[in-house]
Amino acid sequence: MAYQGTGNHSPPGYDDGGHRLQDLPAGNNYEEEASRGLLSSQTGPFTGPFDDPQQRNLSPARPTSGYSLTETYAADAGYHDPYSAGGSVYSAQSGENPATAFGVPGRVASPYARSETSSTEAWRQRQAPGGAGSGGGGGLRRYATRKVKLVQGSVLSVDYPVPSAIQNAIQAKYRNDLEGGSEEFTHMRYTAATCDPNEFTLHNGYNLRPAMYNRHTELLIAITYYNEDKTLTARTLHGVMQNIRDIVNLKKSEFWNKGGPAWQKIVVCLVFDGIDPCDKDVLDVLATVGIYQDGVMKRDVDGKETVAHIFEYTTQLSVTPNQQLIRPTDDGPSTLPPVQMMFCLKQKNSKKINSHRWLFNAFGRILNPEVCILLDAGTKPGHKSLLALWEAFYNDKDLGGACGEIHAMLGKGWRNLINPLVAAQNFEYKISNILDKPLESSFGYVSVLPGAFSAYRFRAIMGRPLEQYFHGDHTLSKQLGKKGIEGMNIFKKNMFLAEDRILCFELVAKAGSKWHLSYVKASKGETDVPEGAAEFISQRRRWLNGSFAAGIYSLMHFGRMYKSGHNIIRMFFLHIQMLYNTFSTILTWFSLASYWLTTSVIMDLVGTPSASNGHTGFPFGKTATPIVNTIVKYAYLGFLLLQFILALGNRPKGSRFSYLASFVVFGIIQLYVVVDALYLVVRAFSGSAPMDFDTTHGVGAFLGSFFGSTGAGIIIIALAATFGLYFVASFMYMDPWHMFTSFPQYMAVQSSYINILNVYAFSNWHDVSWGTKGSDKADALPSAKTTKEGGKETVIEEIDKPQADIDSQFEATVKRALTPYVAPVEKDEKSLDDSYKSFRTRLVTFWIFSNALMAVCITSDGVDKFGFTNSATDRTSRFFQALLWSNAVVALFRFIGACWFLGKTGVMCCFARR
């Protein structure tokens, strides 16, 4: 299908009625017309199931465009566009000069032609007024201008016409159903917010489209973004669009189908944390669906810096993670409904808490939603997951917050599980969702609702919960003083690294309220996990330090629960949970020693010949096994010491090999210990070892001997608490596959969680990663200067582009957006500072380990196994004898030198010239 003009012989304007959707008849007369369709020559990832050459009446030899807008931009016969090349549209695979394809024939290539490279520099150039590839010619076009009145004389809010292809992609039943004069589907609204989020109010002249249309917002879906690529962003955004379609398609809903269409009760808000870190390819994707346009942002308004750029549009378009464009084709259940979208692009990078302040304090207070769902870019919500989250709030009036199940992205055919780190994280996520989250949900207090996939009732978090939460926003540090981030001690700063835990505690402990938190198993989200050791360590540093500090905070302030409105039963279980959390914190604190002692004890039980094991050693015999165990123990302690050396002075990315080697060594040791433990179990049940159970004096005596056992009983308990409990719980939840695909890898990596991650986290407790990055990309944006019209109204002059130019620029944008994503190759080159630190680390490591090796060889009885003929006592005695003689020789040597110098100077003094 292609869009045809209507036959008007005047240039298309903003309210152009042309480009209506029509079926093209078969025949070669329309071959050239079809070839001029948007991206019609693309193949590969652009080809989709809706594009059948037979259905489209195109030649089978001609590659067809999948999931693309097939808008033609050919002008009518009576209208000549002086900037039209007259040829076919510049396609994704053609070798044409873009200056010729989009500009005046014969004109040299414009610097804006580099927009096709999707580089940051090209994006900067497109921000110039009229410079978004306008016509593609060399030099800027001169456009007519229009005067835009500022709201209350200070707020710049402008409506910009969207490309014809986007307008026409909206189904007619929605376009024709709006009130007269509505520009919801024809214009994108841009607002330059020059204020703090707390001042983004109706009183100050700011407003949002859903409120302007008097719509009730039931569900506000927020996507926070930092620097993710367009594949990750499209994965989240397209998943949200599909979930909204699931809600709109509900047939027998008591709520969504009353009081207006369901899609009008849902708003999607994207909050980007700064222009500088933002991937500019993502902006092309957003422009393709209509929620962003190049060249409209203003750096400041009359010298007052813009804090956030806010775009609003209602669209039916979506881009998949494979860069395929989805548009409405019929009224079937697979068609996406209109989605009210807001895009907030913060001018400077000011961290995630500030993004949430824009969401809750600025947009939330105007829209007043019932439920807010928080997603991170890269998290893909599963089928009907957002509906399941909302239903939890709808069915429980006291539910203040909820989260779904987050699982690791495993790739096609679960191929990511080949990486042991990914498999270990997959198992960790699964067990957390099977054991930890349901337990905490039963108590009513889930200690952490992951910021990547969670939901809150808006009125539940209003007040103190958000006030405490926003103390971590460094942009409020001057206003808050000592209560702000700059006035906090290092413990509180670490606490705000796990800001979602703070919000959870404050919500449950809210005075006079009885809000509780819950886990919704039916809601699932998929997220990518770190695949490299360096990235994994850096991520867990923030998680571990933040969660530990927040956990201590919740225990210390548990008394605030008594001011809440929870009933006595809930309070009883909250006390039980507090005791459980206290016990878990103590176990975590001593986990470093616990792992070492467990490793050492199991190896001694199995490898040291004694009467209990029949004077044998497993697995290498009674002679070799003690030697191997001694080597393993010293390797364990040596690499544990290495972790402190690395953590106190190196970046993980600067010590990739050292950390990778540490993971491998600890993994091998852990697997060796697991084999030893299984050997103990086999011996206990095979009769090779005596069973110290009382089976002759009744059940009570048996239980007493079982739980008091120091042999087989304790082994069985440990076995049941790990292998057995995990297997049983996983099968009960009918989700056991991780036990077969990820459990072995998790067992290998488990000790590294303590010996590497915890050591690095605690060694870098001082690193709270606050502060902002410099933002120089905003310099490319133009300023807005106001004038007084008639001495009264404040206006600005804004470029008034013809619709034909908007459409031609859009075609270049779509081509960039739908270009297959190629992941950049990350450079592992060390910086000069990293190389200096690496040398220091090697020097200190060699110094410490060489000294430790000598001390061990002299004093330890364990090295007797290596064939030393004398005992440790004899070696120590001889070492001290050698040391004393060495010091005596050195002292004597120094004394001889001093005497020689004294005698020489005395003699020479007699012969010196006067």
From Swiss-Prot:
Gly residues bias locations: 130-140
Residues annotated as region Disordered? 1-67, 112-140
Q: Which domain of life does this protein belong to?
A: Eukaryota
The membrane topology of this protein is:
Multi-pass membrane protein
Report if keyword Transmembrane helix is assigned: yes
Q: Where in the cell is it found?
A: Cell membrane
TM helices/strands, residue ranges? 543-562, 586-606, 627-647, 662-682, 712-732, 843-863, 882-902
List the keywords (alphabetical): Cell membrane, Cell wall biogenesis/degradation, Glycosyltransferase, Membrane, Transferase, Transmembrane, Transmembrane helix
Write out the GO cellular component annotations: cell septum; plasma membrane
Gene Ontology MF annotations: chitin synthase activity
What's the catalysed reaction? [(1->4)-N-acetyl-beta-D-glucosaminyl](n) + UDP-N-acetyl-alpha-D-glucosamine = [(1->4)-N-acetyl-beta-D-glucosaminyl](n+1) + UDP + H(+)
Q: Does the keyword Cell membrane apply?
A: yes
Q: Which Pfam family name is an example for this entry?
A: Chitin_synth_1
Tell me which EC number(s) this protein carries: 2.4.1.16
Which PANTHER family does the annotation name? CHITIN SYNTHASE, CHITIN SYNTHASE B
Q: What family is it from?
A: Belongs to the chitin synthase family. Class III subfamily.
Name of the protein in question: Chitin synthase B
> Organism classification, top ranks?
Eukaryota, Fungi, Dikarya, Ascomycota, Pezizomycotina
